[in-house]
Every structure is written in structure tokens, then in C-alpha cells.
Amino acid sequence: MSVQAYDPLADERTPEGPQFDVFLAGTVFLDIVFTGLPAMPAAGTEIWAEGMGSCPGGIANLAIATSRLGLRTSLAAAFGDDDYGDFCWRTLEEQESVDLSRSRRFEHWHSPVTVSMAVDRDRSMVTHGHPAPMPASEMIGSPPRSKAVIVTLSPDEPLDTPGSTCNWAELAHRNGALIFADVGWDPSGRWPRSVLEQLGRCHAFMPNATEAMAYTRTDTPRDALYAIADKVPVAVVTDGANGAMAIDSTTGEEAFVPAPRVTALDPTGAGDVFGAGFVLGTLSKWPLSDRLAFAGACAALAVQQFGGSLAAPGWGDIADWWHEVREAAGHSGAYGSSLARRYAFLDRLVPTVPVGAVRRAVATIARYADVGGSPQPATQPATQPTTQPAAQQATQPASQASGEQPATKPSTATPEDEDPNTPRVPAQKE
């Protein structure tokens, strides 16, 4: 596992503290994202996309987002024994510094795959996969010590139910971890209120406005926020381009922060990036308004990139954005001045040391791919990214990865290239 270039919690760490900042569990998908489509293809027709990107998806969206912000992240997930599984494992562990000690490789089980097609700032998806051969609770066993865990609440498997796939979060909570929770879309339309009964064990709940209003049976995001705040110490409701609002009963704070104005290209994973930013702010003990502002800025940076999980910003991206905002404040009107005042706290946070550029999604599954670099022969080690000041970092959007830039050669790696210590578990027979 590579070493993170910047640690925003360095001053908070003690020798006896938890090994990890965040522990996660879930399903990792291989995401293939097509961009620049003029329209969805009609039946019996074929169209060409202007660009494409391949990257780990699912719970990997959140793992990469937290790790890129400098949070020491551990992930428990099942990985297939196919090339897609190799790619996702390698990307998470070697490229994104995510600990996979609680993850497992399973023989004869293929990786779940999602194909996402972006049209007019919206997206449609097709997914295929099978349940993991082993429940998360069995794969994890005793979770590692962490400052926080992030879970998705489910009406079918509540946090405190014995045998639930989420009971690992309860074990982590007993060992001192704060539980940050979100919730998924309910395709049944039932939106059972029993989900909210699980909030008594959570530190924070971070649904979007649609989900919050549906579960609380309210008509406005603010009414939903107040209803949630009666059940959990920290209530957060995100509202897309409108911003986010929150109540922290542990500090007595209430805040609303508008989102920065950006041209959104791909909303994939924006909620995960927001959550990662909010968790960092909470662990750093920032004021509530700063937590919301930082999380909103991270999400705004992510939606300007194609490529799912690898669109998540790193500290170099945040530093570059803040420097641009600060320099433009004097000649960009009231909005620019307001933005600079709102984010002035970043002056004490952005790295003062060089940090490496984060990587964006490449078009195809490639073993050697780097920002501004070229693939190395299979007999030589991959060139490490050059460390440079944040303002000089380059990125490679997914739309450039298939056509506008020289194509990366496909992997020619042999089985000897794989880590022999990677745990592999035989699949359970049906």
C-alpha cells in the first residue's frame, strides 16, 4: 500500500490511537463510464461515445474519496479472481492507499460490473453481478479500530440485529468508532420509517433532500432536517446545487451553506465525496459551517470531472481551487467576495508541502497509467508520479483518455506480477 502524501490529522494522532480513521464495508463494482453521448441509442442502433473511463465503483467511491483527503482508510469487500478484480484491488491498494487487510479474493466469482452512460448531465446505468460468496460480517470478523465507520442503513438488516451484515458497525461502535450513516434510494417507494429507528446508534445521518423528505414524510428539506435532528446528534441534508444544511446538537450549531457554482458534468459519487469531506471535518473538530463548506467544495470539484470514483479531489485539487478563488475575489463581484470569505478557513488547511497529482479514470483496464506519464515496459517497474507543487499538477479527465491523448497500452503483466500474499478464498458452492 502506498503512503499518503499529506495527513490533515497529523496533530490529532497519538501512539495509542486507532490504526485507521475510517473503516468501510460493501460491494466493489468495476465501473465503465461512457461520456459525451449525443443521446441514448435507439433500439437496434449503435452510437459512439466521445470518451470513456474505467474505475472501481460502489463502495470504492467512498473509500477513494476518504483516502484522497488523507484519512487512513480500511475497506472490507469481496473481489473476484478475474482481471477486473485485479484492476480494482490494485487501484485501491497501490494507487489510492486504501488498506485491504479485511478484504478477500474469491475463486470462481466474477466482479460485479456497471456500465454508466452520461447524456445531458444525467446518466443511465446497467449493472450485472452476483451476491458475494461470504457475508461481510464473516469476512470482517472483528473490525479494526477506527475513529469512524460509514454505513448505508437498510430496513431489511438493521444495525443492531444479530447476524445482520451491518453488525460489524455495531462492533466498531463499541470500540469507540463514530457511526456516520447514509441511505439509498428506495425503488419500492415505501420509504419505511423503521430506517430512522436505527439512528439512535449513529453519530450523524447524511441523506439527500429527496430521501430525507421521503423518510420523514415532510414537504421541505428544512422540515426534514428538524425531524432527523430529533433522532441523531448530527443531522445533515444535502440539496444538490442548492447546498447543504445541518444541525449539530453536540455543539448547539445550525448552519446552511450554499454550494459553489460549477458546471456539473457527472454527478456519480458526489454524495460519497461530500460525506468524506464532512467526516474529515468532524474528526478535525471544525465548526459546523466549515464542515459543510468543505464537503460542498469537495463535491463541487468532483462533479466537474468524468470518471466516477477517480473524480474525487485530492488536496492538490483543493489547494488549486482555493488559490483561484482567493486570487479572483477582488475582481469577481459580490459572489466571488462571498466565496472567498466563506472558504477563508482553507488558508490554514491547504498543504504547504508539495503533493502528488491524483489520477483520473483511464479508458481501458491498464496496469501502467499515470497523470502526464507514459507506460513502462512490463519488465521494468512503473515510474512513480513526480511530486510537484499543487498548482502545477496535471489531471487526465476520462473524456481525454480515449482519443485526445495517446492510448495506454493494455497490461502485459504475468501472474508473477501479482502479490503472492493477496488472500484468496475458494468460492462457496451453491
Model-derived features: positions:
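Short pre-catalytic strand/loop immediately N-terminal to key active-site residues, enriched for Gly-Thr
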Residues: 46-55, 257-269, 288-290
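A structural motif shared across PLP-dependent enzymes of the aminotransferase-like
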Residues: 31-35, 55-56
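Short arginine-rich
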Residues: 301-310
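Short, flexible, mixed-charge acidic loops at enzyme active sites
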Residues: 34-42
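Ribokinase/PfkB-type carbohydrate-kinase core domain
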Residues: 1-30, 89-105, 117-256, 286, ...
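Short, small-residue alpha-helix embedded
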Residues: 63-65, 71, 213-214, 265-292, ...
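Substrate-binding N-lobe of the ribokinase-like
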Residues: 5, 9, 22, 42-113, ...
